[in-house]
Curated annotation (Swiss-Prot):
Topology of this chain in the membrane: Multi-pass membrane protein
Lineage: Eukaryota, Metazoa, Chordata, Craniata, Vertebrata
Organism this protein belongs to: Homo sapiens
In-chain residues carrying the UniProt-annotated modification Phosphoserine: 723, 752
Basic and acidic residues compositional bias, start-end: 788-800, 865-880
Identification of the protein by name: Leucine-rich repeat-containing protein 66
Biased composition, class Polar residues, residue ranges: 483-493, 737-746
Low complexity composition bias: residue spans: 709-720
Positions annotated as LRR repeat: 86-107, 110-130, 149-171, 172-193, 196-217, 220-241
Source species, domain of life: Eukaryota
Gene: LRRC66
Biased composition, class Basic residues, residue ranges: 337-354
Amino acid sequence: MKNLYFRVITIVIGLYFTGIMTNASRKSNILFNSECQWNEYILTNCSFTGKCDIPVDISQTAATVDVSFNFFRVLLQSHTKKEEWKIKHLDLSNNLISKITLSPFAYLHALEVLNLSNNAIHSLSLDLLSPKSSWVKRHRSSFRNRFPLLKVLILQRNKLSDTPKGLWKLKSLQSLDLSFNGILQIGWSDFHNCLQLENLCLKSNKIFKIPPQAFKDLKKLQVIDLSNNALITILPMMIIALEFPHLVVDLADNNWQCDDSVAVFQNFISESWRKKWNVICNRSIGSEEANGGTPQSRISRETRLPPIHLHRMKSLIRSKAERPQGGRHTGISTLGKKAKAGSGLRKKQRRLPRSVRSTRDVQAAGKKEDAPQDLALAVCLSVFITFLVAFSLGAFTRPYVDRLWQKKCQSKSPGLDNAYSNEGFYDDMEAAGHTPHPETHLRQVFPHLSLYENQTPFWVTQPHPHATVIPDRTLGRSRKDPGSSQSPGQCGDNTGAGSGNDGAVYSILQRHPHAGNRELMSAAQDHIHRNDILGEWTYETVAQEEPLSAHSVGVSSVAGTSHAVSGSSRYDSNELDPSLSGEITASLCKMLTHAEAQRTGDSKERGGTEQSLWDSQMEFSKERQVSSSIDLLSIQQPRLSGARAEEALSAHYSEVPYGDPRDTGPSVFPPRWDSGLDVTPANKEPVQKSTPSDTCCELESDCDSDEGSLFTLSSISSESARSKTEEAVPDEESLQDESSGASKDNVTAVDSLEENVTFQTIPGKCKNQEDPFEKPLISAPDSGMYKTHLENASDTDRSEGLSPWPRSPGNSPLGDEFPGMFTYDYDTALQSKAAEWHCSLRDLEFSNVDVLQQTPPCSAEVPSDPDKAAFHERDSDILK
């Protein structure tokens, strides 16, 4: 309820005041009530009466009307007769007038004083009534003057920002008060044509700029108040001082900067101006001393400047006009002439007082202090803006950058599946991985003379004096069945010791399952990369289309100085070329024959000294082979005794039947040799023809130590060995017995290991096949027989063997043949019959790289065709 009562009371009071403010007129008798006072037609005071309009029935003879403090907002037009108004003083101060025009007072032609102070006036218009009105037409002459008697206009304490426009229309205006407003600057035409203006009050404004020609036409100007403003520059005021030498000016409370212009104009300004400037500059200098702490000397009146003659300043002339009141005269010329005088006086600025120079220095120091602050502010703003922009860009562009990165990663991911493969080094290995049959891989590798080994391990050789371990074909079976022992039929003459030795070799190979792969790969590569040093017979024979009769073997076991151990392999024994086992058998034949001949020739002459020489030769061979960087698998085996080697040689290499057609050991030679594989068919037993007594292996060695041969045998021992070998053919067995007795003392390892070594082969038929189209021929899968034709000068027998099983494309050996070349097919297997090797070792040479060239063993046969016989004879001559 209380809130309701309060609301009702508020509404009633508001309506009451609203009715008072909106009341437009009063009755005619209100003029004479006690609210307004008048003094016999002289003064009418209606201030603080609360009236909102000018009284309409005031006395026409009243000279002054005071309607101040009546909350006037708009001055309305009077309803009285225009002819009756005699008002001279109108006070409208302390009201709420915000905008005013002087048109309502146009009928007050006698008005002299208009007070509009203490209002909210921010705009003042001096436009009068339109000339179309009847009253203006009747009083045209008086209206033209537009307040002809208005002398005082008071506009102080309002909200003016500029000087009122159109003041020149007030022709009789003598005093103008614009103090306590918000005026910023004075325009050069604001007081133009105000010829009667004497007093101008502009104090307490915000004026910071006054042009020198602003008061140019104010000839009667006597007093000007510019105190409490924002004026700084002295030069415009000096020009005004030159134009109005007797002008009373109040310049206090401004931010004057006293410069050299004060000293320049000391002798040209009036005494009053000089005193004022001295006071102003001393005050400003004192304030600077108090603020800066730097003592400054005051400008004294006795400060003398260089004499300046007035005749040089033609621009300064005396004004002819004199004021009647004081009889004072001022010499003022035009603004342009005074500017020239000022520019001429600036040339004397070098000899300025110390105070003036110090003031300039203070200003420069202030500017220098402000410069770092501005720089710091600029840097801070730039850093902030940069951070803001970078943050915005990062926030908006991050999703797009992530998407682009994901797309880039996805585009690169398929490329990871493309595994790198070095075709130059691993083309054969990749081919072996893709082909299911290793034999087919060998067929692909051999015709192209691949320089690298496949995944099938080879025989690994290690140099060792007087020791040769060559497991027979039962090694393949021992890999499959480690516990099984070798049958007597398979072991030949040494059935008892073969099983133990094979088990020892197998156990060693089990400890090194991949040693053969690594060791033989490096050995085969080193052997192939040094084809030129090993001898030129391989490529020369292909280029000249000559039959091959000898093969150089880069394994040191051929010379009797290394162990030959087959590497462990996960493939079946038929994956490798069986002919290579025949080659190592032939190489062992040569080694044993060489040892036998050497022991036979030297046993009678040197006796016990033969063994020491042989040991030294073996040690030198071992050092030479180590230096050739051939990585070999070191397998410590007992050295074979000379007696076992001689017994194996005297046995004429008995022929043993196959125990298992698939049980073939890995080849000792890498697939670099240009030799084919000859397999005896299963449906045909090997036939041994007559073997002459002169088919023993012959030895021929080059013992020139200057050429760096493998064995540094003396020429005497070499010739003796060769001669003894040739003479000892009839009584071969007796010499073997003698040499066996001489070498039995040098055996330091297991003697039974040699008994396991059985040199077996199927005498193959060597056949030279020529391609009419001069292209490599691959053996047909359905061919069941392979023949080998060889002729030796002393051999006329022919041995022909057939494979116990037909050759298939999967396990068929190499059948590539070159025109003009012999392709020798060798095969070693366990045969049930005893066969003899007919070896021709006439050209056993030792190369400079410790590789022994040897002639592959082959059973000699007499060709049935005379042409073939002649051809074989020529080949044997070449081999010799």
